[in-house]
């Protein structure tokens, strides 16, 4: 199949779902922080190299509970997108996330992760500063942290860059989000040697979170009224807030050792 071939209806539909998840007006992590949480205090830096604005985080109030919020921020316009590196974290972003997870554990705060990235940043500098190790350490930290964790796929959950903040006790997703092993363009370039075959790759990836929900990788889908969260942000964020409060309250009732055992079994059995 050449790059000029017409995509099938199935392929077109699959990539249309990706394009909807990438809509520039969808609610971002900072919108959710502002509308779903109270008294958020941002903490910056990884205490090793610097601060990565693609990852934001700090303690906040969610209902009656103090939580640690960690999010991947994309921005909505050219200025904020550049500021936040289009939501693609560097190693220092993941190290900042690990630092905040350890603080949450120390002070007994549940963790809420807001996932929204096409992938971790793949630049030379990021690789030289240990991108693979930073992602691996975040995966380990999420699996081992001794406090309840909830992750939310807001729009794009791409590759290990998303998974590094998504190995939670509960995983929620906005209805029109995507959650996939790689962006369709990257997958097409690898498998077909042609990034233009992104629609074909999208169909193979089955990126919609409904698929992840069917597989048990996502626990709850947050409904988005037509045409999507970009047109109904306040409604969707209010629904997300209610779901977060409910899941965190449920998780806090479990003995910590039982919670950690469930988390380990959940991810050991993933895909089985």
Residue ranges with predicted function:
Residues 45, 58, 64, 71, ...:
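Glycine-centered flexibility sites
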Residues 35-39, 51, 57, 63-114, ...:
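Glycine-rich beta-alpha loop segments
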Residues 1-67, 71-74, 86, 230, ...:
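Intrinsically disordered, low-complexity segments enriched in small/flexible residues
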Residues 115-245, 249, 253:
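Conserved catalytic cores of soluble enzyme domains
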Residues 27-49, 73-88, 111, 143-158, ...:
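Charged, low-complexity, helix/coiled-coil-prone segments
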Residues 24-31, 55, 92-95, 130, ...:
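Charged, alpha-helix-enriched surfaces in structured cytosolic catalytic cores
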């Amino acid at each position: 199949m050449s790059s000029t071939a017409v995509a099938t209806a199935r392929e077109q539909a699959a990539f249309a779902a990706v394009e909807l998840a990438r809509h520039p007006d969808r609610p971002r992590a900072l919108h959710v922080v502002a509308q779903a949480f109270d008294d958020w205090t941002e903490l910056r830096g990884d205490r090793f190299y610097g601060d990565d604005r693609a990852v934001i985080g700090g303690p906040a109030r969610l209902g009656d509970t103090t939580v640690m919020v960690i999010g991947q921020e994309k921005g909505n316009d050219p200025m904020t997108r550049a500021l936040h590196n289009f939501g693609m974290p560097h190693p220092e972003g993941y190290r900042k996330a690990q630092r905040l997870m350890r603080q949450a554990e120390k002070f007994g705060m549940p963790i809420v992760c807001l996932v929204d990235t096409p992938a971790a940043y793949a630049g030379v500098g990021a690789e030289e500063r240990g991108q693979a190790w930073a992602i691996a350490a975040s995966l380990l930290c999420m699996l081992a942290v001794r406090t309840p964790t909830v992750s939310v796929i807001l729009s794009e959950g791409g590759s290990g860059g998303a998974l590094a903040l998504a190995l939670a006790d509960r995983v929620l997703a906005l209805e029109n989000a995507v959650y996939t092993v790689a962006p369709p363009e990257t997958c097409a370039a690898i498998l077909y040697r042609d990034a233009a075959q992104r629609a074909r790759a999208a169909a193979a990836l089955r990126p919609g979170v409904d698929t992840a929900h069917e597989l048990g990788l996502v626990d709850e889908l947050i409904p988005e009224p037509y045409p999507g969260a970009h047109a109904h942000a306040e409604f969707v964020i209010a629904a997300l807030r209610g779901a977060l409060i409910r899941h965190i309250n449920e998780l806090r009732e479990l003995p910590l050792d039982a919670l950690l055992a469930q988390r380990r079994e959940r991810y050991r059995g993933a895909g089985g």
